[in-house]
Amino acid sequence: MLTHPQFDPVAISLGPMAIRWYGLMYLVGFVLFIVLGNVRIRKGNTVFTPKMLDDLLFWGVLGVILGGRLGQVLFYEPGYYLDHPLEIFMVWKGGMSFHGGFLGVLAASWLFARRNHLSFWQVTDFVAPLVPLGLAAGRLGNFINGELWGRVTAPDKPWAMLFPQARGEDLQLAAGNPQYAQWFAQYGALPRHASQLYEVLLEGIVLFVVLWWFTSRPRARGQASAVFLIGYGIARFVCEYFRSPDEGIFGHSYLISMGQWLSLPMILAGAILWQWSRRHADNRFLR
């Protein structure tokens, strides 16, 4: 059985300034966005320029931070932030929500499209294949931090991992389950899925490969966006069955988690967009 390495959350210390791994992974995601975006631009068949890509990143970063934080507040911890409203602005404390960040990026894409006289789908279809590797970097940051660990699994499974950071939650689970209590007494923590790495694979690497291949030739307007919505929604829905569920606005449930509730509209919206795109397949645009 594996044990989480318990990495130092600080990647680089420069005097009084500390750069944390999680923040560094966000930076990696933004750099990958620029690198992959420039690769697409150099291939041609796109209205985007390097200058437009830089502007798009600026708006995207604002959308990720503002939307991600607002999503964390509204979807996952509304009661806590109602009692501690000033902590809403402490983005380094308490995390951010992907689904909130996604909505923030949609709003940023709409504003960018209006400012540059582009179709909204031109922007989102261009962005879709640039996002997954950034998501993978973020999930890798979660793993390095030893947070958002997976659900309990049997200790004899080759993928079982002990997360010492989860001891508080482990104690609560062990108190109500004799089998868990035995495992906790034996190992000092409960064996869990390393669900962050599953998300790196499915939401990041696999989704990137699918979208990069799909956008390698011109597609009907909105199709790349539809593939992202459906692909991410399904990947997240599956991964949530291995991830320890968060307590959201619908309570704490092991049957269907908050992340799954939020992924269902993405899958539905993607299916609707795909059908709309097929009916307008003659309305193509350059990547």
Swiss-Prot record:
Single GO cellular component term: plasma membrane
BP terms from Gene Ontology: lipoprotein biosynthetic process
Pathway: Protein modification; lipoprotein biosynthesis (diacylglyceryl transfer)
Pfam families per UniProt: LGT
Transmembrane parts of this sequence: 17-37, 56-76, 88-108, 118-138, 194-214, 222-242, 254-274
Superkingdom of the source species: Bacteria
Enzyme nomenclature, EC number: 2.5.1.145
Record keywords, A-Z: Cell inner membrane, Cell membrane, Membrane, Transferase, Transmembrane, Transmembrane helix
Disulfide links within the chain: none
Recorded GO MF terms: phosphatidylglycerol-prolipoprotein diacylglyceryl transferase activity
Family according to the record: Belongs to the Lgt family.
Protein function: Catalyzes the transfer of the diacylglyceryl group from phosphatidylglycerol to the sulfhydryl group of the N-terminal cysteine of a prolipoprotein, the first step in the formation of mature lipoproteins.
Listed name of the protein: Phosphatidylglycerol--prolipoprotein diacylglyceryl transferase
Source organism per UniProt: Laribacter hongkongensis (strain HLHK9)
Gene (name only): lgt
